[in-house]
Amino acid sequence: MLRLPPLAVLLLLTLGACQAPDPLVKPSPTNSPELKSQLTLTNATLEQANAQGQPLWKIQVQSAQYTPDRKQARLKTIRGDLYQDGKVVLKVKADRGEIRDNGAEILLSQNIVALDPRNQAVLYSQEVVWRPQAGILTARQNFRGEHPELVVTATEGRYETGPQFLHLTGQVQADAAEKKLRLTSEALRWEIPNHLLIGAQPLKLVRYSGAEITDQIEAPQARVHLKNRQVFLPNPNQFKSLQPPLQITAQNLTWFYDEKERRLETFSPLTILDYQEEITITGNQGRVDFAQNQVWLTGSTQALSAKNQSRLFADVLMWNIPDRTLDASGNILYE
């Protein structure tokens, strides 16, 4: 075993045609071409540790070609582990790579796969940079992330290995719940342990039943709880359902997108428009149950039919969507 400071390189290798200088030969005052030559290792295991002796990374390579100062190296056929606090946080493989700045940065390129064994998230890209001291893996080309709860693509992905948060930027697309829900935006944060997807920039949500779109919404912000299959929309939003044909406007909407519990709930004023029958109903709070095809509204409710110019006021309204019938109770007034 041979260690090459400062990279703390454990060599399990067969030296190629180029051999290291005779250790008994002292360097001359002049810059010797022999001493300045590159070191090439084959079938080597390389590792780096922090000041406390904890591993930062450990990789096996087909070949490693070092610069004369031994602070940089070009790598081929890489497979290994990336660490944080002495524990493996990513298992990686790639076709090419580089050790930079005395091991403070690892660049991987071409056919990269990175698996987090703690949560089973798999990250794919054509170029990533690992900064062990920061615990951040940045993917810059053709990024894709896969997990049992979610599949994402983006121009760039930045993975914080400590909290296990994935930050996505540029043409982001996220498919959840076996492609029942698709979210698109320019930026998202995926908190993997919390089963949470956060969009702080304008985004679009589309719900599918098979290949057919059932619901869609454009919103300035959203929080998607992947485990519970619900979306919280905190700002004024306009929700459009194609099955049934409803348009719902409200603030602070909670949307349950599971097939068996598909519904909307809000404790703020809302307006519901049946855009085929031209019926509008409003209330101070309400619930739309798509699975049961029913709507409940309470608090200063009213229903307006544009076709027959009629209006109904009540404390409580229940609307049966398929046959367009209304049940009213409390302070009823019909015009």
Task: Enumerate the predicted regions with their spans.
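Mature-chain termini and adjacent capping regions
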Residues: M1-E335
